[in-house]
């Protein structure tokens, strides 16, 4: 592969049918990669306990039905746990981790305390300050600890990092002591995605802008591990009329739902293209023309607000 080759990726979780918002982001990630003459990889983020095996194949079928293709075989995070363990071992050797016994409720209460709240969404550092004796007592309590990244000096608090986004420009976000490994021993999202993107040679990450706050953490971690940092492009989400993220309870929001209403995969593809301000196509095979004229600078910057039809029956 040439050093200049663009490598994009799509990384859904096989926990259910993809809805229109998922498919729209997949289409965008594919267009970014293919319009640059690059590769488009598929990775299943399947470390979540909510994974349901039947959705590996159904998600592949839905995306293929819209005319999107990918390079190589899809990979699964569940097959790559050794990579995550190696990364964690590296950070542990450098004394960049510590055990955390906090519950979500305890974190929320500590972050909101009047003696100096942490920035919104940031871990307040409770377990970082535990003495050895306190840590031993926590371990004896039987709660399996998570593993957090140690960011900066003990008295410094969360850091800030500015990243450049292809669609949104400069974004400054918090880099706190985020989780690397969950209490059940599984790699946490931020660690797994950084390790995977580097291992797969990903140069470009196109994803929903709900993940923008995670980007400074991921860039910081990649640099700590000596890994290449991809370019990022965060795109607006699909929302329902109430301004909330589209969900399956909102109506006919999956490809299967739309087919049951008598629509075709082409109808769904054109709906997605129209939402992006792109020309509609007469057949699935006409996507090459969209790729040829694709310009990310012309994409909408606002969410797509859409009210899907009711489910049939």
Sequence positions of predicted segments:
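Short, mixed-charge aromatic SLiMs
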Residues: 48-58, 240-244, 292-300
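Active-site cores that bind ATP or allylic diphosphates and position pyrophosphate for catalysis
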Residues: 105-248, 254-259, 308-313
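Alpha-helix initiation and N-capping motif
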Residues: 56, 81, 104-107, 120, ...
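N-terminal Rossmann-like or analogous alpha/beta NTP/dinucleotide-binding catalytic cores
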Residues: 1-115, 209-210, 214-227, 285
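Non-catalytic terminal extensions that flank enzyme cores
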Residues: 1-17, 35-40, 137, 152-156, ...
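A general structural signal for well-ordered secondary-structure junctions
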Residues: 69, 97-98, 116-117, 133, ...
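Short secondary-structure transition/capping segments
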Residues: 81-96, 118-125, 143-153, 275-289
């Amino acid at each position: 592969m040439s050093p200049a080759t663009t490598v994009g990726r799509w990384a859904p979780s096989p926990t259910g049918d993809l809805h229109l918002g998922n498919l729209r982001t997949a289409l965008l990630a594919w267009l970014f990669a293919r319009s640059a003459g690059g590769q488009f990889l598929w990775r299943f983020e399947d470390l979540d306990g909510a994974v349901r095996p039947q959705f590996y194949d159904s998600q592949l079928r839905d995306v293929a039905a819209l005319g999107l293709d990918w390079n190589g075989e899809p990979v699964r995070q569940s097959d790559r746990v050794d990579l995550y363990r190696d990364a964690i071992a590296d950070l542990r050797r450098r004394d960049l981790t510590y055990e955390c016994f906090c519950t979500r409720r305890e974190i929320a209460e500590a972050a909101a305390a009047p003696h100096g709240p942490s920035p919104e969404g940031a871990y307040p550092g409770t377990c970082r300050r535990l003495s050895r004796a306190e840590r031993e007592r926590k371990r004896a309590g039987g709660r399996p600890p998570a593993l957090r990244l140690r960011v900066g000096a003990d008295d410094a608090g969360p850091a800030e990092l500015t990243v450049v986004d292809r669609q949104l420009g400069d974004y400054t976000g918090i880099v706190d002591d985020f989780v690397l490994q969950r209490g059940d021993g599984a790699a946490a999202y931020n660690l797994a995605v950084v390790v995977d993107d580097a291992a797969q040679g990903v140069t470009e990450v196109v994803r929903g802008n709900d993940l923008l706050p995670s980007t400074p953490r991921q860039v910081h971690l990649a640099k700590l591990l000596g890994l290449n940092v991809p370019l990022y492009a965060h795109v607006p989400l699909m929302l329902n009329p109430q301004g909330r993220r589209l969900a399956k309870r909102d109506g006919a929001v999956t490809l299967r739902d739309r087919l049951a209403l008598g629509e075709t995969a082409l109808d769904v593809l054109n709906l997605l293209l129209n939402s992006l301000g792109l020309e509609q196509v007469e057949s699935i095979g006409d996507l090459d023309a969209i790729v040829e004229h694709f310009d990310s600078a012309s994409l909408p910057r606002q969410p797509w607000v859409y009210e899907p039809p009711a489910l049939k029956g």
